[in-house]
Amino acid sequence: MCSSDLFNERNLKFTSWAVGKALELNPAAGRAMAESGHEVASHGYRWINYKDFTLEQELDHIRKAFSAIEKSAGKPPVGWYTGRFGKNTLKAVVQHGGILYSSDSYNDDLPYWVKVEATPHLVIPYTLEVNDMKFAVPPGFSQGDGWLQAMTDAFDILYAEGARSPKMMSVGIHCRLAGRPSRAATLARFLDYVASKPKVWVATREQIARHWMKVHPAK
């Protein structure tokens, strides 16, 4: 099954990192996610390493990614996560405009503001700690039990700390990995565990960004 079905069945929303070229080839995917109320954010135009791209080359790919997502999902993205970013990525994202936040950062647990050429920009950090990609790279998860233990341990610590101050947990999942039957069962158990706890907000990154901008605006 596709892991998105597990979210839809529980009326939970997620952020999808969509590669622009992929949506050009399969526009129905973006449409289906948008119609289900999920956020379709950008994962770049191509699944390539951008380290050697010039600023203008990155801007060109950002424009193409925006166009592909808007045509597929019905509106342009407000979130950006290249993953294979280069030295010009953040500057290009801010110069292009229209992006509320980016996530090419792994250095904090909460959103924070940076200035890019004097322009305030919100960063919502990402994490690979409990990412299902660890099923595909060593050393990682070999069975669903290990993934479930890692997710619940991380959640429990953050939930306890959240009684004193805000906390955020990110879980990266991929249909080709977490969508496998045994792993989908693990994800379902984790979603049910999270849903059983009071005062937990399962939010898209756009929702987090808008909340942070309202409560903690750039100074």
Protein language model annotation of sequence segments:
Residues M1-V123, L128, L148-V171, L177-K219:
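Catalytic alpha-helical scaffold of carbohydrate-active enzymes acting on polysaccharides/glycoconjugates
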Residues I124-G146:
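Positively charged, amphipathic and often flexible ligand-engagement surfaces
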Residues M133-A136, G172-R176:
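Active-site-proximal beta-alpha loop/turn segments in soluble metabolic enzymes
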